[in-house]
Amino acid sequence: MASTKKDTHITNLAALEKAANGEIVTLPGWTEEQPFVARLKRASLTGMIRAGKIPNPLIAAAQKLYEGSGKSRANATFEETAKVMRLVVEEALAEPTMEQLKAAGLDLTEEQADQIYLYAIKGAKVLEA
């Protein structure tokens, strides 16, 4: 929530740049013994649309995710919605990248992808709940 306070200081640009680089997050691993630790960044559906990272045929699915499935009038299939979610996950995964995981023969589990998506849209606090 935005607020106005007299004792508030303007955020240092270096701090913003550091935050934009993402943070290290521990995720479920491919096995229970070894967690998957990755650097994740926040993502913006509207920013991805403006940057052309979400193709036009998937805009309705992005709208549905943005507005919430119960509120949205956008007509999108489950497959289209899953594709948009995967694009957000790829955007959020800073280190290793999705390309690096694929090159290593790895694909994210549903649990990993879901947690990365939640982090990308809502931040680290949602993973702590």
Show the residue positions of the predicted features.
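Acidic, aromatic-enriched beta-alpha/helix-loop junctions
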Residues: 45-83
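Low-complexity, intrinsically disordered short peptide segments enriched in small/polar/basic residues
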Residues: 7, 34, 46, 51, ...
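Amphipathic protein-protein interaction modules
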Residues: 75-103, 107
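Hydrophobic beta-strand residues in large extracellular and virion-surface proteins
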Residues: 25, 38-40, 89, 116, ...
